[in-house]
């Protein structure tokens, strides 16, 4: 895309990004494969142009616990729940299924502070941030089981408005998935 002029913006939540693409305000957006497929099944007028593969969105999600003596979600816990984040809300719902917990509605970005301040007991988080951020050493990291986690949450997908053949051709001509993954790998080193 070096020969094309375009702007980039951060928009919180895949649903918001998808709505902006669908409305024509944005030409394309990145979201998790899970969120994109969910929104397409819900009738959104979008389509996936590129799938960047497992681990391209983030390496994986984990469960963070305030109490190091716990190994997972237990009855009575207060658990972070971001109703505006499709990935986080679906993961959280799956993890707490069948347990009597209190879902505490908050932005995903507030999870760490809420855990450290004792306002919640557990929350879903990005494992890449755990590896980079040493203030998280005070929290217990629990890896999610196969039944709790789907690789589609960690897979980046580029979406455009449905049937925008002109834009699709431009993107396919100018974006290489392998080159993008090479750059991503270099950035992560």
Task: Tell what function each PLM region has.
Residues 1-2, 58-111, 164-169, 182-187:
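Bilobed "Venus flytrap"/periplasmic-binding protein-like clamshell domains
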Residues 2-65:
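Short, glycine-/small- and polar/acidic-enriched structural segments
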Residues 46-67, 128-183:
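Periplasmic-binding protein-like
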Residues 27-28, 72-80, 100-102, 119-123, ...:
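Hydrophobic beta-strand segments of well-ordered beta-sheets in folded domains
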Residues 15-29, 94-95, 109-123, 127-128:
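Short helices/loops that flank or line small-molecule/ion binding pockets
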């Amino acid at each position: 895309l070096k020969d094309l002029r375009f702007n980039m913006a951060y928009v919180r939540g895949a649903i918001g990004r998808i709505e902006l693409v669908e409305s024509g305000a944005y030409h394309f957006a990145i979201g998790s494969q899970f969120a994109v497929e969910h929104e397409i099944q819900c009738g959104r007028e979008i389509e996936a142009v590129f799938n960047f593969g497992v681990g391209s969105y983030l390496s994986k999600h984990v469960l963070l616990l305030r109490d190091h003596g716990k190994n997972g979600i237990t009855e009575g816990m207060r658990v972070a729940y971001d109703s505006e984040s499709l990935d986080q809300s679906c993961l959280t719902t799956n993890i707490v299924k069948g347990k009597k917990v209190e879902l505490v509605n908050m932005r995903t970005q507030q999870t760490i502070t809420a855990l450290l301040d004792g306002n919640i007991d557990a929350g879903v988080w990005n494992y890449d941030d755990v590896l980079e951020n040493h203030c998280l050493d005070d929290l217990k990291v629990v890896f999610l089981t196969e039944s709790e986690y789907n690789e589609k949450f960690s897979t980046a997908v580029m979406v455009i408005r449905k049937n925008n053949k002109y834009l699709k051709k431009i993107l396919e001509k100018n974006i290489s998935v392998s080159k993008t993954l090479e750059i991503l790998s270099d950035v992560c080193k």
